A protein has these predicted regions:
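Extended, charged helical/alpha-beta scaffold domains that provide interaction surfaces
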Residues: 1-310
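Short linear clamp-binding motif
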Residues: 315-334
């Protein structure tokens, strides 16, 4: 838009003024005031358009966009699933319209999180009376829906079959290598989880979510292992494999194992999505030893885990039945 002595346009919900170089400094304040008075009706109109719009987008820079213009951004709240929202609006907007827009965007973001991350949100709303089940839910929440099984082995040992059924109904997978939420590995869920996580912890590292559709990554030795685990990839040397694919591979190995030995087949390799050479290397990193039958020269694998020597083992204290996870009760998605 063009007004007397300046040019300007509205981007999203903010005015971008371009004052002429000939304007006196003493005039700038009055010019801005005049511009904002002229543009107030347009801002009110846009609030109505945004509320009726289906063009909102929550981008990976932690901002909410409307028609390619940022209108709000998130900042850390009480936890990563409950961020605070700050709207990006010009001061020309009246208080009623501002509050109307803010309340709408808060609800929009809340509904987005609740819908896309239902299983994760459900963890912190757990009402289980079993401390071990609640403890596992808390650990999953703390680690964005994915944890290594070895880190909670004592908790797992104390979860009954009935409690495991409850966890399974809640979307929790207790696997051979990881405890995770399978639905949280879907593209929309991964993007949203990472977006909220990085905003809460204010992670500024250059990290990119692996391309969706890939089950296997290689030559990633310098990558952030913790970040990739949150994205759903476990590390083995220079390789990364999706945690759900890793579990499926383990099941295929179990199905093919006889007398503690198994042969690889094309289904296993195709599942992982790598070359045969890399598959052999991956199995070795997973502590499977390749051997050859002296009689028929057939190749097979056996599981031979390496035992840690002279290393202090981390002991996980058992949970007191009368000491519930008080912190978990503080984490409620509102």
């Amino acid at each position: 838009m063009r007004l007397y002595q300046y040019k300007g346009k509205v981007k999203g919900m903010q005015i971008d003024l371009d004052l002429k170089s000939g304007s006196l400094k003493t005039d700038i304040k009055s010019l801005k005031k005049a511009a904002r008075q002229a543009i107030e009706p347009e801002l009110m109109r846009r609030v109505g358009m945004i509320i009726k719009s289906d063009e909102l987008k929550f981008a990976m820079d932690h901002k909410i966009y409307w028609i390619d213009n940022p209108i709000a951004h998130i900042v850390p709240g009480k936890d990563y699933l409950n961020p605070k929202l700050k709207i990006l609006v010009d001061e020309a907007i009246n208080l009623e319209s501002k509050e109307k827009l803010e309340n709408y965007l808060k609800k929009w973001l809340h509904d987005l999180i609740k819908t896309e991350l239902f299983d994760l949100v459900n963890l912190i709303n757990s009402k289980s009376k079993n401390n071990y089940e609640r403890g596992l839910s808390f650990q999953l929440f703390e680690n964005n829906g994915i944890i290594k099984r070895e880190s909670v082995v004592e908790i797992i040992k104390n979860i009954s079959k009935e409690d495991r059924v409850n966890l399974r109904k809640a979307g929790v997978k207790i696997g051979r290598y990881h405890i995770f939420l399978p639905k949280m590995l879907k593209p929309n869920a991964v993007n949203l989880r990472i977006n909220l996580w990085s905003a809460y912890f204010q992670e500024n590292k250059e990290t990119a979510i692996p391309k969706f559709g890939l089950n296997f990554l290689q030559n990633q030795i310098k990558k952030n292992q913790k970040f990739l685990l949150i994205c759903g990839f476990e590390n083995f040397g220079i390789f990364y494999i999706r945690v759900d694919i890793l579990e499926r591979l383990f099941l295929k190995i179990i199905e093919s194992t006889k007398d503690r030995k198994f042969k690889i087949n094309s289904d296993m390799i195709n599942l992982v999505g790598c070359s045969k050479e890399n598959f052999f290397k991956l199995l070795e990193l997973m502590q499977y030893k390749r051997k050859i039958n002296n009689e028929n020269k057939e190749e097979f694998f056996v599981y031979q885990p390496k035992h840690k020597k002279n290393k202090e083992r981390k002991i996980v204290k058992k949970l007191n039945k009368n000491a519930p996870f008080d912190k978990l009760s503080e984490l409620r998605f509102r």
